[in-house]
Amino acid sequence: NLRLDTTAQREVLYGHDVVSDIFLENLKSATPWILKSVNIKLLADQVDHGKRDHLLHICAHFSNLIKVSEQVGVRHDAGRALLRLAHLLATDQRNEIAVELLKGLEVGEYEFSKYIPEYLGEFALWLPPEQLDDMIERLHILLANGNERIVSVALDTLGVLLECYSRYTVRFHESEEVSEERRMKLLGLILSCLANYREQVRQEALLVIGQHIFGSQILAERDKSRMFSLCAKKLLFLLNENKGGELSLYYRAATLSHIDRFIAHYQLFGGLVETRTREKIAFFPGTFDPFTLSHKEIAKKIQELGFTVFLAIDEFSWSKKTQPHLVRRQIVNMSIAD
């Protein structure tokens, strides 16, 4: 732009292999954060100019910076650069990077892992359907982890996946039925955490529902309306079932504020928000056993026929082990929340 001769500078940048030197410099704790950010832009610029011999190593380097960098700005610069280069990677390379980021969630140090979901959620949407389903299943397993911090970041990742999921159908051209089924699975996993017995997990679920679904600037209003019609009744039930302490009150208020704002905006510009109602009623005979998968499948099949299914719970059976009614009620809630 200044009409200066930059031949010498271009020779320095693109005439030599500087990638390994940058890798080494970025991993030094003594390197100032501003230099690391410039190095990230330089590595991405190398790829933009056709030097793709080290593409996988550059993306792996970015994923490492997201996981271990001490400076938040460097993490975000690396994350944005990784997402910008994701489409250039081969399928197996994308899976390798996604697995590395997923391992970062399992560290359990929330101060480091809390920045990963924002980028893992979007990056995972570059995986083909089979690998994406495997990623969702691994996140599902993490939701049962004993460490609440690991559960929280897994939940955040599911929220980002659901929020940005509309991009996936454009990239991989799946049928509407398959796409909707996966979207409902993601929503079900988030709702299942709202029935969790740990208050911190329930709070994180409320945060995800409020910010990544109904408060999202990415999700289309039509998609929000469809999800609201599916989960409104269950959401209302679970909010009243596990009220938690004073801090949960503020989480609940923030989530309801996002939902209220969405409803007001949708009714003003899009039309009425409808909720699904079923006029047909079915009672599940005997005591519902949440540990028996066949019981749950029977109830789901009846529900798919258009029935509202009521489940009976008492203090007995379940292999003859007596438990308090409210304890059993909470176990059943966790079983059917998805």
Which positions does each model-derived feature cover?
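Nucleotidyltransferase catalytic core that binds NTPs
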Residues: P117, G121, L142, S152-D338
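N-terminal "cap/leader" segments of large eukaryotic alpha-helical scaffolds
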Residues: N1-I34
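Alpha-helix N-cap/helix-start positions at coil->helix boundaries
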Residues: P32-I34, Q71-H76, E109-K114, E148-S152, ...
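HEAT/HEAT-like alpha-solenoid repeats
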Residues: S20-T31, A60-E70, V99-V107, I136-A144, ...
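Short sequence/structural elements of tandem HEAT/ARM alpha-solenoid repeats
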Residues: Y14-V18, R52-A60, T91-E100, P129-R138, ...
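Residue-level signature of alpha-solenoid helical repeat scaffolds
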Residues: V38-D45, A60, R80-R84, E118-E122, ...
